[in-house]
Amino acid sequence: MKQYYMQQLETYFDDDGKSTGFKTIFDQLMITGMQALLKDPNSATAKSQFVGYAGALTEYFNGMAGNLEKVQKDINQEIKLKVDQINSLAGEIASLNKQINTIELAGTKANELRDRRTLLIDELSKIVDVEVKETPIIDANNENRETGANRYMVKIAGGQMLVDGSDYNGLECVARTSYEKVNQTDIDGLYEVYWADGQKFNLYNASMGGDLAGLIQMRDGNNGENFTGQVTATGTTTTADGKTHDTVTVKVTKAYLQDLNKCNLSDQGGIIDLGNQEFYYDSWEYTCEYDANGNATYTYTFTLSDSEKNPRGITNDRVGKKAEIGTDLSYQGIPYYMNQMNEWIRTFSQKFNDILTSGYSGSGDPGVKMFTGNKATSSEQFLLDDAAKRYDKQEKKNSKVTVKVNDDSYYRLTAKNFDILDAMEQDPSLMANRKNASDGVEQNDLLNDLKNLATDKSKMSFRGCNASEFLQCILSDVALNASRANTFYASFKDISATIDNQRISISGVDEDEEAVNLVKYQNGYNLASKMIQTLTAIYD
């Protein structure tokens, strides 16, 4: 499973000259387009061309987000198919158990049915890790007598009972609602799996195994970067509708949670686990606070949903408990690659826009932003103009910045909604090219700063690389995961072949051996026939 989907990701991210990828598009913007601008900074044609190249960059990320969403959707559907297969196989195994016991109670061995059941177990073990146990059923009136029937049990994913004799426990896929999303970039309707009795089936069980484990890791893999922290306070707040809601504040220490550009928390609400108790939340806000010594504290405050979703209100005994959203999955799946794109987009857009807005256009007007994002619920775009929300620019002593999930912060930018500011697209002359309004229109000092943004790590750094090396970082991840998947597949194939050969050596048919036996039996038959003919002649 991983092998197939990692090959897809390699194809999507590839930039081999046959397909236009990130490097080609980024070089058009920061080399081809920039060189034309540097030669003629106030040229309407050069600015229009540059904005066009910038638009191609946003469209590239839009397309990549769409491709990865499609892969996640395909994986999600395949998970449902695998769950349906498990149910079908469980039903067949339970039915065979009943038939086998019916026959064997009469003293006859049901070899053919047992072989069929073994094949079903083999098929099930490809989907999920399987444990089988068969025990004889003892006569209730005589503990020394076996009835001839057996109790055949099948457990999956680390000991969870699937089949017990002629009964089986079915599984059901239930789509997450929009307010149950784990990641900001997740598509709607990702499946959770439940037992027929309503108990949740743990999809993230370390003993899952099989195709199902691979699919879950590809769909939900976050490189171990889920939300986690410690509850420091509980309280209440009054929302815009006048209702009072519980709140919980969580201190975070992970670097990827302290930087909002790396944040992948859902912006539509979700489920947070507080000391092994789950609560729905509607929104959150991020706070970065520096004390007098320059020590920073990072917290997230979640506004919990009403009592309809949270019939059990939060209590102060949650303070000090671990808070967690989602699951720590070390594999680099779709959420990981989506978040990598988001981080690069947010960081690059911040740096690029900051340079533009610090200068002036050819007409002497203050520079405007180039990159923004489109709001999902309207035709409007994010403004990204509230300096008070820029935690990356706050004073490093005695300062506090709070960013709410719905603020127009750079957190709102994603690969899916990334776009050019409408005003800039309609009038490229708004693009700044000089640092001082008093300089001549041919001044290009600000453009040089933009040019350096592509290659100077001190201007922008992404995973220790410069802005232009984004694709190398991603492709190295994809290539490594693809290589591991290929190696695992080859090893599994070899082990499977070895097991099949062992089975064949015991239960299979050797054609040469059968041919020798056939000749031997034929010769024996011929000799016996001649002996009978001879004895018959003597008696006659």
Feature locations, PLM:
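Structural signature of extracellular appendage/secretion-system components
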Residues: M1-D540
